[in-house]
Swiss-Prot record:
SUPFAM superfamilies, alphabetized: Kazal-type serine protease inhibitors
Name of the protein in question: Ovomucoid
Keyword vocabulary terms for this entry: Disulfide bond, Glycoprotein, Protease inhibitor, Repeat, Secreted, Serine protease inhibitor
Organism of provenance: Meleagris gallopavo
Site (Reactive bond 2 for trypsin): K88, A89
Domain notes: Avian ovomucoid consists of three homologous, tandem Kazal family inhibitory domains.
GO CC annotations on file: extracellular region
Length: 185
């Protein structure tokens, strides 16, 4: 669902760029990137980062969709390891780790084999938009950052309040820190 971004007031920031002023209606919506935003913050992200995220549904994004791995047949290997038997049907699901699995059974098998607890974020392939997200930090570091709150989640699983704070941390990490996704971790 497209969000009408023209209804939000805008101003010019210290870098001379148009930015939206998001202060009023902060009701949560779930973006097509799987991240919870408000409608205004979603528009602000799209403007600032050149993305084209739209609204999936009202309310916060569900972290994971429940799945029942016990419904898949399993066997015990010669080494005594339990293995889930999956068919080859291509019915992709997106894991909470951002990886697309061929089907729900394959995701269950991955968790059993690797000892992980990856959940199902949604049916269908993971959206490429999220993986291609990046932030231009070439103008950083800066000595001071504004207090505007537009959270970004770093690859260190830490939430940064805005692009400036994130980019300063990227510079400090010598480029090892990358953007995981927009929004809180």
């Amino acid at each position: 669902v497209e969000v009408d971004c023209s209804r939000f007031p805008n101003t010019t920031n210290e870098e001379g760029k148009d930015v939206l002023v998001c202060t009023e209606d902060l009701r949560p919506i779930c973006g097509t990137d799987g991240v919870t935003h408000s409608e205004c913050l979603l528009c602000a992200y799209n403007i600032e980062y050149g993305t084209n995220i739209s609204k999936e549904h009202d309310g916060e994004c569900r972290e994971a969709v429940p799945m029942d791995c016990s419904r898949y047949p399993n066997t015990t290997s010669e080494e005594g390891k339990v293995m889930i038997l999956c068919n080859k049907a291509l019915n992709p699901v997106c894991g909470t780790d951002g990886v697309t699995y061929d089907n729900e059974c394959v995701l269950c098998a991955h968790n059993l084999e690797q000892g992980t607890s990856v959940g199902k974020k949604h049916d269908g392939e993971c959206r490429k938009e999220l993986a291609a997200v990046s932030v231009d930090c070439s103008e950083y570091p800066k000595p001071a950052c504004t207090l505007e709150y537009r959270p970004l989640c770093g690859s260190d699983n830490k939430t940064y309040g805005n692009k400036c704070n994130f980019c300063n941390a990227v510079v400090e990490s010598n480029g090892t820190l990358t953007l995981s996704h927009f929004g809180k971790c």
